Each structure stands twice: as structure tokens, then as C-alpha cells.
Amino acid sequence: MADEEKLPPGWEKRMSRSSGRVYYFNHITNASQWERPSGNSSGSGKNGQGEPTRVRCSHLLVKHSQSRRPSSWRQEKITRTKEEALELINGYIQKIKSGEEDFESLASQFSDCSSAKARGDLGAFSRGQMQKPFEDASFALRTGEMSGPVFTDSGIHIILRTE
């Protein structure tokens, strides 16, 4: 029976005090609905092709001297080359893949984005809100999947899709 199946991530079953009916609430997106959520959806919606209209991602950004704003909360003036930034990114990817480090701790320690304070979490976003290469990579990832190096005007990113 469908009611016995596990709910998608973020969803919980609640009882309406006013109507006495069961409804479903997503504590990540704050969405609520009467119908049981299906599949891997976290309330982010799907377009007509079954693609999500919103995703949630975390990232680790390494800026370099050619970044559009070569400074960060970690360093006032970033002087590393693009090649050095890519070496750092590839090193972080290896540490994550080997299990030596987890994504969130590396993002909080080494990301040049202020989202480091949130362990790299950028929250949910729709198409058109991020730089195109970042957006394309984010929407191409499956939930729980990590990207390789993604190049934008901001620098080089590792992206982890969380929803």
C-alpha cells in the first residue's frame, strides 16, 4: 500500500487541526499539500518534461586572480593562478571521493564563498538565478551527486546537489 512507503526526503505526514485530514509538509521547502508526494521530489516542482524547476545545491568555490572579484572572506586579495585553483579543486575532489574528508567540512574551511558559513549550502534556486555554467551543472546532477570542476566568472566550483 502506498501509505506504507517511505516519503521522499524532507517530507513528513501531519494532521490538520482544522479539518482532521492528513496532509504532507516539506520541512526543507516549507511546502504543504494534501496529496502524498511521489517519487524523489522534495516539493521543488517539475516542468512538463519531468525535470525539476528548482534544485538545492551546496558548493565549494576556489577563486583565482582572474575571478570577477578576486577576494573573499578568507583572503583580501587572491593571487593564485587559475591552474593553482584547479589543482586545489582536484585535490578536494580526491579527498571527498576517497572518504578522507566530507564535502561540508571542506566547503566550510576552504570555500571562497560566504556560503562556507552554511557548509556550502546555497539553498534552493530556479533556472536563471545562477551563472549559466553553474546552473547547467546543478540541474544536470542527480540528488546526492557531486560535480567535477565547474568554471564560472566567479572561479572554479565543486557542486553537490542536495535536493
Swiss-Prot record:
Alphabetized GO MF terms: cis-trans isomerase activity; peptidyl-prolyl cis-trans isomerase activity
Gene Ontology CC annotation, any one: nuclear speck
Protein name: Peptidyl-prolyl cis-trans isomerase NIMA-interacting 1
Subunit structure: Interacts with STIL. Interacts with KIF20B. Interacts with NEK6. Interacts (via WW domain) with PRKX. Interacts with BTK. Interacts (via PpiC domain) with DAPK1. Interacts with the phosphorylated form of RAF1. Interacts (via WW domain) with ATCAY; upon NGF stimulation. Interacts with PML (isoform PML-4). Interacts with BCL6. Interacts with FBXW7, disrupting FBXW7 dimerization and promoting FBXW7 autoubiquitination and degradation. Directly interacts with RBBP8/CtIP; this interaction depends upon RBBP8 phosphorylation.
Function: Peptidyl-prolyl cis/trans isomerase (PPIase) that binds to and isomerizes specific phosphorylated Ser/Thr-Pro (pSer/Thr-Pro) motifs. By inducing conformational changes in a subset of phosphorylated proteins, acts as a molecular switch in multiple cellular processes. Displays a preference for acidic residues located N-terminally to the proline bond to be isomerized. Regulates mitosis presumably by interacting with NIMA and attenuating its mitosis-promoting activity. Down-regulates kinase activity of BTK.
PANTHER family with a match to the protein in the record: PEPTIDYL-PROLYL CIS-TRANS ISOMERASE (PTHR10657), PEPTIDYL-PROLYL CIS-TRANS ISOMERASE-RELATED (PTHR10657:SF4)
Catalytic activity: [protein]-peptidylproline (omega=180) = [protein]-peptidylproline (omega=0)
Origin species: Bos taurus
Main location (coarse class): nucleus
Residues with Phosphoserine modification: 71, 108
Residue ranges constituting the PpiC domain according to the UniProt record: 52-163
Post-translation changes: Phosphorylation at Ser-71 by DAPK1 results in inhibition of its catalytic activity, nuclear localization, and its ability to induce centrosome amplification, chromosome instability and cell transformation. Ser-71 is dephosphorylated upon IL33-stimulation of dendritic cells.
CDD domains named among the record's database cross-references: WW (cd00201)
Positions of the UniProt region annotated as Disordered: 33-54
Subcellular location as annotated: Nucleus; Nucleus speckle; Cytoplasm
The UniProt record lists the keyword Transmembrane: no
Residues bearing the modification N6-acetyllysine: 46
Alphabetical keyword list: Acetylation, Cell cycle, Cytoplasm, Isomerase, Nucleus, Phosphoprotein, Rotamase
Catalytic class of the enzyme: isomerase
EC number in record: 5.2.1.8
Family annotation (PROSITE patterns): PPIC_PPIASE_1, PPIC_PPIASE_2, WW_DOMAIN_1, WW_DOMAIN_2
GO BP annotations, alphabetical order: negative regulation of amyloid-beta formation; protein peptidyl-prolyl isomerization; regulation of cell population proliferation; regulation of protein stability; response to hypoxia
